[in-house]
UniProtKB/Swiss-Prot annotation:
<feature type="active site" description="Tele-AMP-histidine intermediate">
    <location>
        <position position="306"/>
    </location>
</feature>
<protein>
    <recommendedName>
        <fullName>RNA 3'-terminal phosphate cyclase</fullName>
        <ecNumber>6.5.1.4</ecNumber>
    </recommendedName>
</protein>
<dbReference type="InterPro" id="IPR037136">
    <property type="entry name" value="RNA3'_phos_cyclase_dom_sf"/>
</dbReference>
<dbReference type="InterPro" id="IPR013792">
    <property type="entry name" value="RNA3'P_cycl/enolpyr_Trfase_a/b"/>
</dbReference>
<dbReference type="GO" id="GO:0005737">
    <property type="term" value="C:cytoplasm"/>
</dbReference>
<keyword id="KW-0067">ATP-binding</keyword>
<dbReference type="InterPro" id="IPR023797">
    <property type="entry name" value="RNA3'_phos_cyclase_dom"/>
</dbReference>
<dbReference type="GO" id="GO:0003963">
    <property type="term" value="F:RNA-3'-phosphate cyclase activity"/>
</dbReference>
<feature type="binding site">
    <location>
        <position position="101"/>
    </location>
    <ligand>
        <name>ATP</name>
    </ligand>
</feature>
<comment type="similarity">
    <text>Belongs to the RNA 3'-terminal cyclase family. Type 1 subfamily.</text>
</comment>
<dbReference type="GO" id="GO:0005524">
    <property type="term" value="F:ATP binding"/>
</dbReference>
<dbReference type="Pfam" id="PF01137">
    <property type="entry name" value="RTC"/>
</dbReference>
<dbReference type="InterPro" id="IPR017770">
    <property type="entry name" value="RNA3'_term_phos_cyc_type_1"/>
</dbReference>
<dbReference type="InterPro" id="IPR036553">
    <property type="entry name" value="RPTC_insert"/>
</dbReference>
<feature type="binding site">
    <location>
        <begin position="282"/>
        <end position="285"/>
    </location>
    <ligand>
        <name>ATP</name>
    </ligand>
</feature>
<dbReference type="InterPro" id="IPR020719">
    <property type="entry name" value="RNA3'_term_phos_cycl-like_CS"/>
</dbReference>
<keyword id="KW-0436">Ligase</keyword>
Length: 337
């Protein structure tokens, strides 16, 4: 059984999520202890338990310690169950997108359909539009297709969002994403839920003003939804090159002007573009598991402590050689033995 110190490195929920994903894919059980030991509210929280529950449902796993506040978890996976429908509610503050990241690599070609309720656009995790515009599009480039249906949006603290992820199929193989290539267009989605439509327009116009100096077409659409459970706004952007995609997002909050939201996302996008990386700081972390599973290399925007921690967990499950060089940007290469 693989032993994992949950306080290692950045010591957050990503250690658990990566472990769950790779445990199911490899069939290797693990024990994680000191879960989130250095955080203000240590131990498993509700959103972490839903990741455990989802993976348990998919693989009929045996578990011990899967309860709120637990600082230790044992997870013993069995065979992944195909042709499965799973419904889950990760709570008002729970991130739908973090669940998608955890589950998706493990259900490729398994005919699993998952309905997730919770927060689609919440702090400290990628927004659902980033997942649609960037994450899923880059996965398509490496041979993985997935259908995502955004039924309702959910913002902190009320939640109420709903997403279906299904038809996750493909034949991924070794890949090389070492440059963005010539920038061709910037796409985006500016949204509001149960707020005036002009907020989405102002976010969009603010981002467009800053991005116009890049000299490429800009296509930002607005998504205005009234009558949602939660109120909120945000914008996600994707700079599409001939070979890869760089993304960024920003969320509104009380007291934060719509123009600031749009400007923030645009400046994050430009900062990532200026690193000359092939993928942005979010995707630098998320692509690592796919590169490690199939053999791949890419240039990430920044080697964060989060990415470094992820790398060390991956090496516990997979017999691979990882070469990393640089910091901002960094080059990641995984070779499968």
């Amino acid at each position: 059984m693989i032993e994992i110190d949950g306080s290692f490195g950045e010591g957050g929920g990503q250690i658990l999520r990566t472990s769950l994903t790779l445990s199911i894919i490899t069939g290797k059980p693990f024990r994680i202890f000191n879960i989130r030991a250095n955080r203000p509210n240590p131990g498993l929280q509700r959103q972490h338990l839903w990741a455990v529950k989802a993976m348990k449902m998919i693989s009929n796993a045996e578990t011990k310690g899967d309860e709120v506040g637990s600082k230790e978890l044992i997870f013993v996976p069995h065979e992944i169950k195909g042709n499965t429908n799973i419904d889950m509610d990760v709570g008002t503050a729970g991130s739908v997108t973090l669940i998608i990241q955890t589950v998706l690599p493990a259900i490729i070609n398994k005919n699993v359909r998952i309905r997730i309720k919770g927060g689609t656009d919440v702090p400290k995790s990628p927004t659902i539009d980033y997942i649609r515009l960037v994450y899923l599009e880059i996965l398509r480039k490496i041979g993985i297709e997935a259908k995502l249906n955004l039924i309702k949006r959910g913002h902190y603290p009320e939640g109420g969002g709903e997403v279906i992820i299904e038809n996750v199929n493909g034949n991924p193989s070794a890949f090389s994403l070492l440059e963005l290539g010539k920038l061709t267009i910037i796409k985006g989605i500016s949204h509001v839920s149960s707020l005036p439509a002009h907020i989405a327009e102002r976010q969009m116009n603010s981002a467009r003003e800053i991005l116009s100096k890049l000299g490429v077409p800009i296509e930002i659409e607005t998504d205005v939804r009234q009558g949602e459970v939660s109120k909120g706004s945000g914008i996600a952007l994707a700079a599409i090159g001939e070979k890869s995609i760089i993304g960024a997002d920003s969320l509104g909050e009380r007291g934060k002007r719509a123009e600031i939201v749009g400007e923030e996302a645009a400046r994050i996008l430009i900062n990532n573009l200026n690193t000359k990386a092939s993928v942005d700081i979010h995707m630098s972390d998320m692509l690592m598991i796919f590169a490690s599973l199939y053999g791949g290399e890419y240039i990430g925007a920044e080697l964060t402590s989060h990415a470094y921690t992820n790398m060390e967990i991956i090496k516990k499950f997979l017999d691979i050689k990882i070469d990393v060089s640089g910091k901002r940007p960094f080059r990641f290469k995984a070779k499968i033995f």
